[in-house]
Amino acid sequence: MRHRHGLRKLNRTSSHRLAMLRNMSNSLLQHELIKTTVPKAKELRKVVEPLITLAKKDTVANRRLAFARLRDRDMVTKLFNELGPRFATRPGGYTRILKFGFRQGDNAPMALVELLDRPEVAEAVEVDGAAE
């Protein structure tokens, strides 16, 4: 019976799953928005949210714990210098999962995973006067 097992295997070995979630965590922390399948997104949320909670208190021990999970010094620095202070007053729920349709090849349900309170990106505004 599969009662009370806390994770999805995602058709991968444990080492492959760990490496994939580590890479996806680094990508999410770097870009603050990634596109993936819904089951991977739900598993990624279980990895990233505790890391952000860890980053709210900047200690050497917490940095080492985060580095043990991410294995990327630049992402640990961003996590503690930018993301930790950004979410200091939020008591949890740092990510949002938005359903994003289905993948073309295999019809897998896709999702966008984003960090909340992202800074707005200024989009280029087209000038209508140039077309005249």
Curated annotation (Swiss-Prot):
Give the coiled coil ranges: none
A molecular-function term among this protein's GO annotations: structural constituent of ribosome
Cellular component, GO annotation: cytosolic large ribosomal subunit
Subunit info here reads: Part of the 50S ribosomal subunit. Contacts protein L32.
Q: Which family does it belong to?
A: Belongs to the bacterial ribosomal protein bL17 family.
KW Ribosomal protein (keyword) present: yes
The gene for this chain is rplQ
Protein name (Swiss-Prot/TrEMBL): Large ribosomal subunit protein bL17
- Note the Pfam families from the entry: Ribosomal_L17 (PF01196)
Enumerate the UniProt keywords alphabetically. Ribonucleoprotein, Ribosomal protein
Tree of life domain:
Bacteria
Keyword Ribonucleoprotein carried by entry = yes
Gene Ontology biological-process annotations: translation
